[in-house]
């Protein structure tokens, strides 16, 4: 049974290093009782060759359970990759696994889960702003990187009016995008933000308490009850406690990094 849930952002293949960092900083953790949720771009299925298998083998040897939200720089998990869909009691829902690497588990592209007692919605996928660079330079780019339109419609339909304690995604709703982090050399008119627009509708279509995402390569609080992850690893329980306390006091720990928009809101601008 998983007793310790941790959250982190994009690892881009450096998974065993991220786990080593976790275990070195929290030596009291028992690997078999610990799970690390990666909010997309874990990179286990990026090269689709022996490099991926080495990555998986090194990570599997750590003994920590890994749960992956699908990002944009990785193939969709599924039968084509030699995986099977199983019911996972740790998360109260279906996950994809490979028999050779049972500690590495992949959420479905969207779905309902129960994680540490929290009613959870998981949403995978995003657009790659470097799509054309990747194509021009023969780098990996996955045509189905974004959530499929039929999945978006089904997700919207099945979440309407429902409550979720937690939303885990790779990208985020349009209004929560960290626009100050957009790359200056990328022409934003070429960026497909249809998924973020859809997620904005989704966010207003349901009730949710806490939203965690990655993709933009920064660790900080974006807005009340919304956090972005990259390199940091944090206890899910600590995150929940933080926002429960915030609702009671309106205060956050002074050292927490916050977005410019969040800072302006807190200063009353």
Predicted regions and their residues:
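A general structural motif
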Residues: 1-2, 31-33, 63, 117, ...
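Beta-strand-turn-beta hairpins that frame and shape the catalytic cleft
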Residues: 1-6, 112-122, 166, 223-229
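Short, charged N-terminal beta->alpha structural module
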Residues: 1-21, 127-138
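Active-site neighborhood of phospho(di)ester-bond hydrolases with catalytic His/Asp-centered motifs
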Residues: 7-10, 36-41, 66-73, 107-108, ...
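Core catalytic region of metal-dependent phosphoesterases/phosphodiesterases
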Residues: 8, 13-115, 188, 192-195, ...
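A short acidic (Asp/Glu
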Residues: 17-19, 47-50, 78-81, 132-133, ...
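Active-site-proximal loop/helix segment associated with metal-binding centers of metalloenzymes
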Residues: 90, 95-96, 102, 116-193
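Binuclear metal-dependent phosphoesterase catalytic core
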Residues: 116, 200-205, 216-269
């Amino acid at each position: 049974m998983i007793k310790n849930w941790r959250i982190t952002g994009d690892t881009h293949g450096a998974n065993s290093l991220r786990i080593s960092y976790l275990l070195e900083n929290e030596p009291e953790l028992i690997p078999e009782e610990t799970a690390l949720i990666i909010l997309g771009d874990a990179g286990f299925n990026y090269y689709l060759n022996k490099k991926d298998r080495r990555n998986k083998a090194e990570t599997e040897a750590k003994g920590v359970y890994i749960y992956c939200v699908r990002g944009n720089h990785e193939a969709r998990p599924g039968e084509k990759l030699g995986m099977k869909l199983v019911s996972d009691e740790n998360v109260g829902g279906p996950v994809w696994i490979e028999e050779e690497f049972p500690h590495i588990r992949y959420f479905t592209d969207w779905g309902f889960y129960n994680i540490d007692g929290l009613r959870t919605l998981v949403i995978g996928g995003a657009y790659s702003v470097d799509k054309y660079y990747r194509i021009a330079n023969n780098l990996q780019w996955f045509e189905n990187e974004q959530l499929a339109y039929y999945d978006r419609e089904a997700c919207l339909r099945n979440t309407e009016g429902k409550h979720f304690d937690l939303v885990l995604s790779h990208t985020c709703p349009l209004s929560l995008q960290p626009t100050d982090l957009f790359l200056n050399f990328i022409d934003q008119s070429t960026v497909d933000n249809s998924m973020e627009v859809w997620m904005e509708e989704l966010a207003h279509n349901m009730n949710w308490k806490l939203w965690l995402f990655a993709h933009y390569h920064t660790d900080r609080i974006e807005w009340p009850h919304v956090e972005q992850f990259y390199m940091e690893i944090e206890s899910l329980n600590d995150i929940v406690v933080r926002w429960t306390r915030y609702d009671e006091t309106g205060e956050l720990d002074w050292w927490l990094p916050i977005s410019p928009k969040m800072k302006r809101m807190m200063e009353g601008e």
